[in-house]
Design a protein with these regions (language model features):
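A recurrent flexible, glycine/aromatic-enriched loop bordering the glycosyltransferase active site
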Residues: 132-138, 321-333, 342-360
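A conserved acidic beta->alpha catalytic loop
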Residues: 60-63, 255-263, 302-303
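Acidic donor-binding/catalytic loop of UDP-sugar-dependent glycosyltransferases
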Residues: 109-122, 261, 300-314, 384
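Hydrophobic helical membrane-anchoring modules
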Residues: 202-220, 384-445
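Short aromatic/hydrophobic "clamp" motif used to bind/position activated sugar donors
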Residues: 104, 295
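Short, well-formed alpha-helical segments that are part of the catalytic scaffolds
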Residues: 14-46, 230-244
């Protein structure tokens, strides 16, 4: 028998009963599955904890087949007892210490970042302190440990407030016991917590490889935002593509005041948002209406890969934003060179344009303030802002095919159009008034 005990405090995962604060962001079944992912990660983590392991579970019918299947043999199982969460934790600690253990630490399971080193540190610290408590970033606590069962810290009236940690620490010290604040972690209770975990994963291989990380990546919510203005010739074809290949994504069309039948042609199965005219304004309005973790800005004259949602998710495992790159629906030599230059600029210089299918972490989009609402060059300004902040786009394996409608004509007319587009960008880089450039560009958006 080890001198130390570690209690994993959880419940039997049941759809509609567990992680309910994540609904409707996740379905009841997904809430159950992410809870199972937490338990898988805790099983693996607990193998490196220098203590005997106890799993205290809650179950409405007393049965715990999922918990048992995940943790297997080698741990001791007990059903939680008590009238509320505080008394249940106290009774678990009291029961385990009554078995003769010198010290005991208890944690919940919705802290997928928790490391075994932190649990061992808490147990080690009980050699010198009466109690240890680990704060969560939302003001609660994820860990509590004791050498003797003290009931007062568990008599709180409210366990869902931002003062739980402080009230618990006050209760311990008011009784004359010594207490150490140990490592702070963030838990996962809300969709915001999911998004913060997603961003943390991109720089932490351990989190990406965890069962929780793999689940979150595979179920990342993608919002497809399509700004439209007089697109009756293209909007039906894009909807056909999206109905086929975006079944698990949110699709939002943002109409900037079309004077043709564009808005009427948009299927009620997609969300239609009205906004002022201007692509930047429309995309920002779409982002405000979106619920996804990842925002994908798509032009209406695009042809997208069948598996574009999975390609976005794959890139976003390691990157905060990315793009598809572009190819054109023309074999014209000058369009081929345009493709090469555009993709080189996106991936080597970090300046993707809008027709290359930019997608971005929602939190990062909000952090930089979205698109600057200028009449033209909003994509250049957006990418430049990200590059200045140190962000470079990730690259998908496939390309978006975009229309060459702006380049119609004979070869010399294509060259003239290419030159005009280059000159517009050059003027913008050199500080010419963007409104003057927009007048030269013409009213095509």
């Amino acid at each position: 028998m080890n001198r130390r005990a570690y209690i994993i405090f959880t419940r039997e995962p049941v759809a509609g009963k567990t992680k309910t604060r994540l609904m409707p962001y996740y379905s009841p079944e997904q809430c159950r599955d992410i809870h199972c992912a937490f338990l898988d990660d805790f099983r693996d983590m607990s193998r490196d904890v220098d203590a005997d392991i106890f799993v205290y579970y809650y179950s409405e019918n007393g049965e715990y087949p999922i918990v048992r299947d995940i943790f297997g043999d080698g741990v001791t199982y007990h059903e939680q007892e008590g009238s509320d969460i505080g008394y249940k934790m106290y009774n678990a600690i009291k029961d385990v210490l009554s078995l003769g253990y010198y010290s005991c630490v208890l944690t919940g399971t919705d802290i997928p970042k928790l490391r075994a080193e932190s649990v061992n540190y808490a147990l080690d610290s009980l050699e010198d302190y009466d109690c240890v408590v680990g704060r969560t970033t939302d003001g609660g606590y994820h860990l509590i440990g004791m050498k003797e069962a003290i009931s007062e810290p568990f008599h709180l009236e409210e366990y869902a407030s931002e003062s739980v940690y402080e009230n618990t620490m006050d209760a311990i010290t008011s009784m004359g016991y010594s207490v150490l604040a140990v490592d702070e972690y963030s838990d996962i209770d809300t969709p915001t917590d999911i998004r913060e975990f997603m961003r943390a994963m991109r720089s932490d291989l351990r989190l990406r490889k965890s069962r929780t990380g793999r689940f979150i990546d595979a179920n990342a919510k993608v919002s497809v935002i399509v700004p439209v203005y007089n697109e009756e010739k293209t909007v039906i074809d894009l909807q056909v593509q999206l109905k086929k290949n975006a079944t698990d994504a949110e699709v939002i069309f943002v109409d900037g005041g079309s004077t043709d039948k564009t808005a009427e042609l948009i299927s009620p199965s997609f969300k239609l948002v009205k906004s002022g005219k201007g692509r930047a304004c429309q995309m920002n309005e779409g982002a405000r209406a979106a619920s996804g973790d990842i925002l994908f800005f798509l032009h209406c004259d695009s042809r997208i890969p069948d598996d574009f949602i999975n390609q976005i998710r794959k890139v976003m495992e390691k990157h905060d934003y990315g793009c598809f790159g572009v190819r054109f629906d023309s074999k014209h030599f000058f369009m081929w060179t345009n493709r090469i230059i555009s993709n080189f600029r996106a991936w080597r210089r970090g300046i993707p344009f809008g027709d290359q299918g930019i997608f971005i972490d929602r939190g990062l989009f909000e952090e930089i303030g979205g698109f600057e609402e200028i009449p033209i060059m909003e994509d250049v300004e957006f990418s430049t802002t990200l590059r200045k902040k140190g962000y470079m786009p990730g690259k998908t394996k496939s390309r978006i095919t975009t229309s060459t409608r702006r380049y119609d004509g004979k070869w010399y007319q294509v060259m003239i159009t290419e030159y005009k587009m280059w000159s517009f960008r050059r003027k913008y880089r050199h500080g010419k008034d963007v409104n003057e450039i927009a007048k030269e560009y013409g009213d095509v958006r």
